[in-house]
């Protein structure tokens, strides 16, 4: 059998080396396979690699990795982590997708790897790390990627997202899953830096552990680790407006803003406040919302707390429906005259101890929806929806690893374009994709880049902005050898984002003597 198969293999190999003639719609083309050329579809990765090298964060991540092999034939931890990072950058959602970058020798050289390892090597490497050592390693790396940017007042957003599962994974339980009811899932309790849309931590739990009480311990731990970089406001939706979360913030003296569930007592409060005349005026600035302030002590609360009730008049031509006893869906307001005269209101009740005016509270809470855009990007444009294994341990590592690469890439994109944030769907074609061909001569490597994007001028401008940031850090490091380069880089980028601060008003001049 082996003798019969050998000629077939030889014929296939010979055919792959022959010149092929292809008749295309644009004419005749000659095609030849070239598996030895140093080429990459991610030519601009070299600029991102320089960004990481100047800050030293990738080296720090690799050096702190608890992976240790005893076999001399095993892959190095730098190769494993570099392969995982490259796969995440390229948009991989599963371990098998890493095979798509396996032959990228140019990327391997840019990241200082001996070679790109297989997806099985990545799986086995993550499994070889004990949870008690990998947990603090990844938490520290994730917090380090953001912490030095928290010198200005910032908002901590709390939220959880559902990760549907399609296999027999550990912790795959049927719980709250609004998009795919009945589908087993995991839950990612996530802690965001508001507006910057950066991840401070992500904790993976089973599908039934979706409530806020499963995020209490991670929140306490995160606030302890932040120390003097604590947020100016802790913000969350209705799942976090309970005594436990409020008590955590109040014990630390942190302002908070949470939405309340519309329980019976909350509805009674709405009915009582509806008749009051001191509602704020609806305007374009408030997006049609009116607000009023009061206090309430709900069941289970240790004290009465300040609440802000928001209401907005709903648009006309709204159809109300109801179900009959037989389950038939009917209109609750069948007559047009009744429907036209009805005034329908939408209500939101917020609990807060923040010392802000009523008019500002509503917009401050509406800004929270920006973290939903972060979830959408991480799940659909990065790898948070995938990289699933039978054990939760590796899924937790990859969830934090994806968030870490996402944070690094976000800083890189903001260095390139400080004026606006770009999601991966637009930033990758601009700042990662380019056909690169490497040539080596006399110990020097030259990379020729051919961008496929139409805005080549914009790309060059953005790369120049990145080089300006790197040049700033290098010049500062020459004068201060002990400088924290990553902290200096983040301060530079944040300064570019917010713009120059206003100069303080000089004190009045003293009167002349005599």
Can you say where each PLM-predicted feature lies in the sequence?
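Short amphipathic alpha-helical "interface-anchor" segments enriched in bulky aromatics
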Residues: 51, 98, 288, 358-401, ...
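Flexible loop/turn segments at secondary-structure boundaries
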Residues: 106-108, 163-165, 198, 209, ...
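Dynamic "connector" segments at or just before major functional cores
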Residues: 1-225, 249, 436-514
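Short, solvent-exposed helix-loop connector elements
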Residues: 65-72, 358-365, 381-397, 412-425, ...
